[in-house]
From Swiss-Prot:
Catalytic activity: L-glutamyl-tRNA(Gln) + L-glutamine + ATP + H2O = L-glutaminyl-tRNA(Gln) + L-glutamate + ADP + phosphate + H(+)
Database matches in PANTHER family: GLUTAMYL-TRNA(GLN) AMIDOTRANSFERASE SUBUNIT A, TRANSAMIDASE
Family recorded in the similarity comment: Belongs to the amidase family. GatA subfamily.
Record-linked SUPFAM superfamilies: Amidase signature (AS) enzymes
Catalytic residues identified in the record: K76 (charge relay system), S154 (charge relay system), S178 (acyl-ester intermediate)
Keywords: ATP-binding, Ligase, Nucleotide-binding, Protein biosynthesis
One cellular-component annotation, GO: glutamyl-tRNA(Gln) amidotransferase complex
EC number per UniProt: 6.3.5.7
Pfam families: Amidase (PF01425)
Organism ancestry: Bacteria, Pseudomonadati, Pseudomonadota, Alphaproteobacteria, Rhodobacterales
Function: Allows the formation of correctly charged Gln-tRNA(Gln) through the transamidation of misacylated Glu-tRNA(Gln) in organisms which lack glutaminyl-tRNA synthetase. The reaction takes place in the presence of glutamine and ATP through an activated gamma-phospho-Glu-tRNA(Gln).
Protein name, as recorded: Glutamyl-tRNA(Gln) amidotransferase subunit A
Enzyme class: ligase
GO biological process: translation
Source organism per UniProt: Cereibacter sphaeroides (strain ATCC 17023 / DSM 158 / JCM 6121 / CCUG 31486 / LMG 2827 / NBRC 12203 / NCIMB 8253 / ATH 2.4.1.) (Rhodobacter sphaeroides)
Amino acid sequence: MNANELTIADARDALAKGELSAVDLTMACLTAIDAGTPLNAFVHATPEIALDQARAADARRGAGAGALNGIPLGIKDLFCTRGVASQAASNILKGFKPEYESTVTSKLFEAGAVMLGKLNMDEFAMGSSNETSCYGDAVNPWKVDDRRLTPGGSSGGSAAAVAADLCLAATGTDTGGSIRQPAAFTGIVGIKPTYGRVSRWGIVAFASSLDQAGPMTKSVRDAAILLGAMAGHDPKDSTSADIPVPDFEAALTGDIRGRKIGIPREYRMEGMPAEIEALWARGREMLADAGAEIVDISLPHTKYALPAYYVIAPAEASSNLARYDGVRYGHRARLGQGDGIVDMYEKTRAEGFGKEVQRRVMIGTYVLSAGFYDAYYNRARKVRALIKRDFDEAFAAGVDAILTPATPSSAFGLGEMADADPVAMYLNDVFTVTVNLAGLPGISVPVGLDAKGLPLGLQLIGRPWDEAGLLNHAHVLERAAGFVEKPRKWW
């Protein structure tokens, strides 16, 4: 086994015993990144920074070293990294190098992590297939015939890099499923924490009331380790919760006897593939065999989640993206003679934003306009409150976690849905958006392969602030499923 194929937990042990140096581990990842160019996962590699950090980690080894000392990670391009290009995969931020570090990356570096570089994503995190990126498509390491498949989105580069062993783990962000859907498409683990568990400071904003950062890893244990380093109160983020961070790894007891797992009947969608239904049934059996009690529950407002999400998220995006005007940073359009400031705004935004971002800004501006605010935005906010209430009632009735499919299908081909009706693409988030609207933690765990040999995942949804319990349920599901398949290397 090459060092880059290790999990965080195994690498941590090997580093502690002196069987491996952080420099060797980092070099193995940098070699894999060079070989993995066809995946287009890393868009800004930072080998010099990585090796400097690895040497420092080796010097620190032993007492007092952080939980991630010497562990090489990939960072989604949405996180501001000081002095390193941070473009949110958009032409409008071309050449932008922040003068400050995001709270998440600061915490990772304090824990001793090594940054291998920045990862591909959908532009401004708007997309479900990593096809809206200014860097071009990220490619799923899993393949069927000669079709290039999507790794999912928006954290597609993160998912592809972890699944292909280019890094030990990666950061992602999740606004409507952008950690969990790509994790399911690539056979890895991805957790979206409770809204407010991880600081959003220094993460380029898409929809501020929905965005949440989280880890994308090779195992549930790794997710627990990485989340422990990322989480915590941050006075610089007013939505960050001042709640103690438990030892998530210590919570992985593997004992869920007597725990109640809810199965929401509304997630049985019309036209759902039989494979997804069968996988869901298998997941129920695995948790029941581990001693959990399986109960049917109702989340009656589920069917309104996607329409509400695609009003609220674009509305917040149109407000957040108003700051990109070519005045202070990023791209500025070349102006003609006689052009004024308004011409500069219009030309800069037309050149800098891709089609999907433009579409969502237009939708958002429309639903926030005076004539339509009550009909769309206010109504969507009311629906959001009802969706949250559905979950609150289920948890109040004693449910500890909720089991659902993660995605309505396995990974689809690049280009196959991009030209279709955008609504068809938006349906990829059908099982995940409710979790963001309610601010809950959710995790995707790989459980099996479909008939084509592509990975499928199940989602577990937890009580607010109970990532520890959620990770333990996911740990049980992961062990029972025994998913060890890896993509066959073609790159």
